[in-house]
């Protein structure tokens, strides 16, 4: 019994270490290929539209209602301590530091990550990736680099727009639902907001964009055979991206805001 358990643990440990090694090599090749010609500008523009513009409505709606709910919940809690004047500050700091980047990252991971993994996995199953080799085209340069570049560019833009819309959601609830004075609310919003709060959120967004794109491409590129392989690649891309987003979010927060 103990030998079986040890064998099982060792088997999964070796498999995990092998996956980490392959992923590290894949990431290194992808990063080094970004600076090499050709650039495939048309593919980058196409991915910019897909990852950024088409994700904007979902991100905007999510951050708007998150800001609105945050204002309501903050009022419910802070009113017990007569600290209602701090609601605007809590809303803007929570959105710019944490909620904006994390929510946008998880949404893009679910929407874009699944699509990227499924698309590349389907190309792998139908041997389109192998066909690129016969055309003297580097599959990683052609399939991975445009998506990584587009994700790194668009994620900070999505987060910045989402932060603004989320603050607007909190503002509208504060003014029309909680009867705050408009001028006082806006003053409280920007009184304690510092550049580092916004910058840290944008850096998180950039890291999240890289995580989503590289993991999704990796999951699709090394997918299994058949429809089952495509499904597993899609699930793996979303789950692993979401987990790494939350882990990296803590690490970046620890780096910028040490207690």
UniProtKB/Swiss-Prot annotation:
Cellular localization per UniProt: Cell inner membrane
A GO cellular component entry from the record: ATP-binding cassette (ABC) transporter complex
GO MF annotations in UniProt: phospholipid transporter activity
Transmembrane residue ranges: 13-35, 49-69, 148-168, 195-215, 237-257
Membrane topology term: Multi-pass membrane protein
NCBIfam families in UniProt: MlaE family lipid ABC transporter permease subunit
Family indicated by similarity: Belongs to the MlaE permease family.
Described purpose of this protein according to its UniProt entry: Could be part of an ABC transporter complex.
Protein name: Probable ABC transporter permease protein RP096
Organism: Rickettsia prowazekii (strain Madrid E)
Taxonomy of the source species: Bacteria, Pseudomonadati, Pseudomonadota, Alphaproteobacteria, Rickettsiales
């Amino acid at each position: 019994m103990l030998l079986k358990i040890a064998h099982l643990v060792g088997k999964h440990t070796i498999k995990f270490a092998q996956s980490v090694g392959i992923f590290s090599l894949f990431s290194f090749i992808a990063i080094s290929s970004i600076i090499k010609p050709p650039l495939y500008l048309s593919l980058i523009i196409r991915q910019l539209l897909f990852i950024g513009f088409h994700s904007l409505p979902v991100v905007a709606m999510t951050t708007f209602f998150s800001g609105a709910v945050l204002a309501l919940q903050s009022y419910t809690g802070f009113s017990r301590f007569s600290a209602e004047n701090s609601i605007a500050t809590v809303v803007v700091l929570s959105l710019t530091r944490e909620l904006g980047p994390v929510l946008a990252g998880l949404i893009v991971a679910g929407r874009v990550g699944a699509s990227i993994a499924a698309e590349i996995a389907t190309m792998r199953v139908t041997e389109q990736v192998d066909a690129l080799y016969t055309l003297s085209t580097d599959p990683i340069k052609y399939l991975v680099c445009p998506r990584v570049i587009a994700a790194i560019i668009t994620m900070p833009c999505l987060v910045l727009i989402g932060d603004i819309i989320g603050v607007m959601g909190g503002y509208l609830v504060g003014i029309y639902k909680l009867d705050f004075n408009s001028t006082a609310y806006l003053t409280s919003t920007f009184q304690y907001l510092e550049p580092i709060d916004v910058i840290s959120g944008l850096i998180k967004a950039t890291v999240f964009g890289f995580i989503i794109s590289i993991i999704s491409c990796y999951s699709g590129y090394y997918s299994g055979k058949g429809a089952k392989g495509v499904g597993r690649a899609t699930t793996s891309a979303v789950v692993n991206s979401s987990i790494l987003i939350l882990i990296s979010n803590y690490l970046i927060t620890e780096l910028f805001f040490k207690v």
